[in-house]
Each structure stands twice: as structure tokens, then as C-alpha cells.
């Protein structure tokens, strides 16, 4: 081995770590980190000092955030279930999604927004359930108020979403605020859009009091909607995401195509076009669609033509147990038999290239 290279060789893994592009939100890996709060705070790679401080100071909040990761990743996978990129996660990768989010694409915009929303949702819910020392129900919702139906009393436990938003902003945005590059600004914008999305679906719920439920007196509280509403809303924002470029002074965005409107704080923004995700690509972090189940009768993104990228599909027949011949019995039960059902399953063919199965 060449002498100068021999001196560098022991340091090569560290040098590669420094030079490799990085996905900012390493806190996503908190889902996979068990043990005490100290173990979690010290072993999640990539946290900046502010995030570690908050982690050590608020271990109960970190547990809520860690549990919330599973919820928002499941929501991401639900929204992308019929698409070539299906929000698949990598258990052994501290970025959770691998290299696919290194590209400043619409998919990256959605993941940053849904993850930020997930933190708000998880913290706010934990507050209302009395699981956090630093917060409880919304202290501002007290006394009497009015709405279109008349006067009511604040009661019950209103979700303290403002606390959830403040903590999420401090923790999630900490790493991006240390950077001044375009990607950091993109992430901050989409993080904020995600937080705002949760608050958008805060709803007033009421209980009537009076003779025979006459509603002479109402007690009301504010509650977050099911997280699916936030996911559906951000999915619509993903489909309408706006491609942007940095402005000349590097402090904000301008639309890449002048025919499109300027993005609002609720919109998702991105810089780069997405890959087609058709084949496994180590550099792009794309797992490809070989082996994915497709829908032969669909004309949408889950159709065999679109999902398989024109490569064709294989068909296999499987059997599964289903309920059949169900009958209503008085009173009051439905009884069914177990039947075997045969059905065809269509899966995308692999590319003809010999290296398609190379691990990412």
C-alpha cells in the first residue's frame, strides 16, 4: 500500500462519515432506542446540543416523542401505500429512511411535515393524559365563552396544543436552525407547515346538561382530531407541493415556475424533482418496485402498469381464510362459517439488469 494512503487508512471510516451527506432529523431514530432516558439521549446519533439538553431535561416528553414516531411513520406509509415509494423505513439506519431523503424532493417535504406534526400530536396527547410533568390541560380554557349556539362553560380537559407546538418547534427545529443552507430553510418551512396542520383540526366538543338532555347548560373543551385528518390534509399538500428556488440574498424562497403562486406557510415546498423510484438505486435510496403487489384493474398509481414501470408482472394464486355464509340469529348475533378463498396476486417483475438486487 502507498505510504501516504497507509497513514490515512485507519481514519477513512471517520472521514467518510464527515463527508457523507446527512439527513437532519436523526431524532426519528428515537423509535428504535430503548432503555433509560440517559441511554436514549446519549445514543441517538446526530442530535445537536440543544436537542440533547431538552432530552435530558424532559425524559417523559422524549418517551412520548419516541412512541409518536411509530404513529406518524404508519400514517406516512398509509398515505403512500399505493405509490412506488411507500415510505418504507430502515430499522438499522439512524435516519430511519436512508438516503432517499437526502434529495430535497416532495417526498422529503412530506416526511418532514408529517414528522413535525406527529411530535405536536404525541406531546399534546401526553399532556392531556397527565403523562408529562411540564404540562397539563390547556390552562387558558376556563370560565364562560360564547359560540354560534350560545353561552357555554369551559370544562373537561382542553388539549394544550400550544405547548405541543412550542416544544416541537424547540426540539425538532434545533438542528436546522444551526444551518443557513437552502435545505435547512426548506426543512424549517415544512416543519412549520406540519405543526400548523395539527392545530388546523383542533375542534370544539361539548356535552349537554339539563332535563332530558335539553342542553340548558353546555360544557365544552378543545380536542385534537384523529391524526388521520392531519395525514390526509398533508397528503393533499404533498400533491400540491410547490417547487421553489432560493432568492438572491439567500433568506427565503421564490417559485421555480413563475406561473405558480407563492407558497404560503401552509404549503409544502421542495427544490428537486423526485426520482421515478422504479429500480433499486443505492445512491438515490430507492428500493425499487420489484416484488411490489399491484392492482390489475386499477388505473391509478397502484395499477400494474404504473407500479411496475412497464416491466410487467407475475401472477400467483393464493388461498386465504375468510368469513362466509353469514346469518343473523335472533337475538342478536351474526354467525359465519370459515371458508377458503382463492385469489390471484400480481407482483411487479424485476428489471432485467443483473444488479437490481444489490443491497442498498
UniProtKB/Swiss-Prot annotation:
Entry keyword set: Developmental protein, Disulfide bond, Extracellular matrix, Glycoprotein, Lipoprotein, Secreted, Signal, Wnt signaling pathway
Cell compartments where the protein resides: Secreted, Extracellular space, Extracellular matrix; Secreted
Signal peptide span: 1-25
GO molecular function: cytokine activity; frizzled binding
PTM comment text: Palmitoleoylation is required for efficient binding to frizzled receptors. Depalmitoleoylation leads to Wnt signaling pathway inhibition.
Glycan-carrying positions: 295
Lipid-conjugated positions (O-palmitoleoyl serine): 212
Pfam families named in the record: wnt
InterPro entries (UniProt xref): Wnt, Wnt2, Wnt_C, Wnt_CS
GO cellular component, one term: cytoplasm
Highest taxon listed in the record's lineage: Eukaryota
Biological process terms in GO annotation: atrial cardiac muscle tissue morphogenesis; canonical Wnt signaling pathway; cardiac epithelial to mesenchymal transition; cardiac muscle cell proliferation; cell fate commitment; cell proliferation in midbrain; cell-cell signaling; cellular response to transforming growth factor beta stimulus
Cysteine-cysteine disulfides: 76-87, 127-135, 137-157, 206-220, 208-215, 278-309, 294-304, 308-348, 324-339, 326-336, 331-332
Role according to the record: Ligand for members of the frizzled family of seven transmembrane receptors. Functions in the canonical Wnt signaling pathway that results in activation of transcription factors of the TCF/LEF family. Functions as a upstream regulator of FGF10 expression. Plays an important role in embryonic lung development. May contribute to embryonic brain development by regulating the proliferation of dopaminergic precursors and neurons.
Family label: Belongs to the Wnt family.
Protein name per Swiss-Prot or TrEMBL: Protein Wnt-2
